[in-house]
Structure formats: structure tokens, C-alpha cells
Amino acid sequence: MAEVEYRCFVGGLAWATNDESLEQAFSQFGDITDSKIINDRETGRSRGFGFVTFKDEKSMRDAIEGMNGQELDGRNITVNEAQSRGSGGGGGRREGGGGGYGGGGGYGGRREGGGGGGYGGRREGGGGGYGGGGGGYGGRREGGDGGYGGGGGGSRW
């Protein structure tokens, strides 16, 4: 496998939180190599989650321990270890992501970019889930294969 990344998934973020304030909040735990808020490609607005990557495992573990459930910009955040990029889809076990928070459709639809698999994972096109690629609760989108009510964008519910 490629180099190990010590990456935290950070969920429940306020819309106002940006890459810099995310990094600032976590920098007390060790050297950060990357911090990124995931934005909606169409609106440019934060999707309410992001990733912080540390230089070493101890810093990552300390950050998870120290920040999970804490308040950042007025919201209680969730912090846990991110799925590794090579693991496929954390929630969906599908090629190219699937499931989880934002990956492969997940909660809130189609995405490109982001982390890997599970939480916000790498994907282009379809996917399903709530609001996902082929429709579901989020309406008609191009590509993809359904989820709840998916396929052609319709839901029979």
C-alpha cells in the first residue's frame, strides 16, 4: 500500500468554518500536513465536513481524543479516523466510493473530489443514496444507479 496518511474526518462543521480555522483548531495536537473543508461543487458552500491530515499517528489520535464532541464555531463536531483512500467505499463497498457521508451519493448527492471512500469519498457521476446520482430524494441527476427511489430520478414513495 502507498504511504500511510494520518487523516481525521471532521463532521458537523458550521458553514462559517474554513480551511484556516479548521487547521488552527487542530494545530494544538501536532504538525498538520493538510486541512480541507469539502465544498459543494455546484453552490460552493461548505458541505459541513472536512479532513485534517497530521504528520504522525500520535497527533491524529490526540486530535480525535481531544476534539471529538467539542465545539468549533458554535457547533459540536464529530472527529474520527478517516477511511484510507485505498479501502474502497466505507459504507457502500462499491467501486469508486459509495455510501458513507457524501461518498458515492451518501447524504447529499453527487460529488467529485473529497477524501477517499466512506466519508466524502472520491467519485465522479452517479451513486445513489439520499439525493444521489440517479435521483433518489434529491431529484434527477445524470449518471448513476439509484439508491432510494433512484434510477430515473423518480421516487414511488
Swiss-Prot record:
SUPFAM superfamilies in the cross-refs: RNA-binding domain, RBD (SSF54928)
Any Pfam family matching the protein: RRM_1
Spans annotated as Disordered: 70-157
Keywords: RNA-binding
CDD domains: RRM2_NsCP33_like
Molecular-function GO term, any one: RNA binding
SMART domains in UniProt: RRM (SM00360)
Record's note on what induces expression: In response to stress by wounding.
Domain spans labelled RRM: 6-84
Amino acid composition bias (Gly residues), ranges on this chain: 86-138, 145-157
Record-linked InterPro entries: Nucleotide-bd_a/b_plait_sf (IPR012677), RBD_domain_sf (IPR035979), RRM2_NsCP33-like (IPR048289), RRM_dom (IPR000504), SLIRP/GR-RBP-like (IPR052462)
Protein function: May play a role in the biosynthesis and processing of heterogeneous nuclear RNA and in the maturation of specific mRNAs in response to wounding.
Protein name: Glycine-rich RNA-binding protein
